[in-house]
Amino acid sequence: MKPIVVFILLLLTACSEPLDTASARQEKHAAQTTIIRDSFGVPHIYGKTDTDAVFGLLYAQCEDDFQRVEDNYIWAIGRLAEVEGQSAIYSDLRAKLFMTTDEAKAMYEKAPEDIKALCMAFADGINYYLKTHPEVRPKLIDHFEPWMPMYFSEGSIGGDIERISEKKIRAFYENGAALPKEEALAIARAASEEEPAGSNGIAISGAHTKNGNAMLLINPHTSFFFRGEVHVNSEEGLAAYGAVTWGQFFVYQGFNEKTAWMHTSTYTDVMDEYLETIIKNDSGLFYQYGEEQREVSVSEVRLKFKDSLGIIQEKSFPKYRTHHGPITHMEAGQWVASAMMWDPVTALKQSFIRTKQDNYKGFKAMMDLRTNSSNNTVYADAEGNIAYFHGNFIPKRDVTFDFTQPVDGSNPATDWQGLHTVEENILLLNPENGWLQNCNSTPYTAALQYSPKPEDYPVYMSKDQENFRGVHAISLLSEINQIDLDGLITLAHDPFLPAFEALIPGLVSAFDQWGQPSGEMNAAIEVLRQWDFKTSEDSVAMTLAHFYGTLYGTKGQATFCHVRYGTHDLFWQ
């Protein structure tokens, strides 16, 4: 691509500040960093050191969309209510239940020097942008700090913490109660009716490619502006191209000169809830654990919020914690502690060094840091290897307990028993068929008959079900032969929709049997009857099927299978 704009950040000719000051450090980074934008506007960042490259990466992100960089940190560090008002205060409390600002600062101070340097370069890149662009007015954060990435080590579109219900937190911390059952059911129902989303990853070995090299399809499904596209390089071995979540200092999924990786959201069970037996007496607050009574950690969280007049106010909350995790809500009259992966320093390390691996051995060793809790990973490399890692952070559990429900926190047997190693996790390397796929689907069909077997793993390692994206991928991959890049692009955009092949014939049959003839309805059914189940930009059938599929998803078989029993009206009448 032909460069159209070149930005070279210049060192001031004279600087009276000591070298260790923030200003001097930023100017040194600027002198050692070049940002070249190609004809698509993608920044290609070149730094002398990794920290120079990170500095330039954050500067370039701010050039592209400072608002989203700031928004992500306003949310992540728990200051959303200062912008959006008191309605957001329980989002902020959720963040602080897992880590206060002081705890984040302490984690940063104790981090290895290389991680601290990357975090400092992150802050310097944003602050230098703000200093050199005085016309940019932040909503709230006018100075970024190196401890802030401790809150934002997760690059996926739906991080673990978002699975903790704000409404349940509010019910407990405002009223000391459980969320009413009807409201909890409404939350679950709303979640099931959200717009579908997902990601598709495919790795193909050289045995099936025209040039003999392995290929990787990275097809992440996010909102249009959730991530930027970047190319970031240093003289210390960093050379990664791919997607970066706004405000993070690592390429989340992409490739370097030797390895390529992508992520799909996983349904591996990585979070648990513990029902705590609370004892209050004159000595304080305790919880039962086996034969002993342990003290509940109690502290205070003070949060700011903007009131209806735009004035900043403060509100205090108690913060309760057991060794299982913070108390987040109440169930059946018992306090519930939520356990999940919370190791920001290691997570940042894993996310950054992932981008610098040059072979499968190094990549697998990186994966054994085991902090990528919300994702699966599809992998390919220049040596011809293809691999699939199902999950990454997976606690060992006693399978006699049902961890899909809150478990008894007073029973030590329910505690996590360390983490499974990568070798113990569901792992697929170079299957004989020469390809593998994951589309947020079960790992047990990743490579057809060469897939991992469910009987070899604990049930909590995969709750993932097969889906029609997975079915479609398997169908296409089973036919590949000597595929090239153009062929892979064509495969990725194949218009056939197997879900509707399964769904629409039932609708047509039901209408033929029970429908009331009418001009419009007959015409619509005839369009669907003649459809080849392929989508296109002018497909009327696709539009009809989409709306029917949405109704079917919310009402299920009630739309046509139960009408014969008189329990539901036909929705088209």
Spans of features found by a protein language model:
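Sec-dependent signal peptide recognition
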Residues: K2-I8
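Gly/Pro-rich active-site capping loops and adjacent beta-alpha segments
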Residues: G47, D52-T100, M262-I312, A413-R469
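Ordered core of a single globular domain
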Residues: D343-V345, D358-K364, L369-T371, V378, ...
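Hydrophobic alpha-helical segments
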Residues: G242, F249, N372-I480, T535, ...
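C-terminal motif of bacterial Sec signal peptides marking the signal peptidase cleavage site
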Residues: T13-A14
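Glycine- and hydrophobic-rich flexible loops that cap the catalytic core of alpha/beta enzyme folds
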Residues: G237, A243-Q248, G254-T259, H263-V407
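Substrate-recognition/specificity elements adjacent to catalytic centers across diverse enzyme folds
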Residues: D20-R227, E235-L238, G242-F250
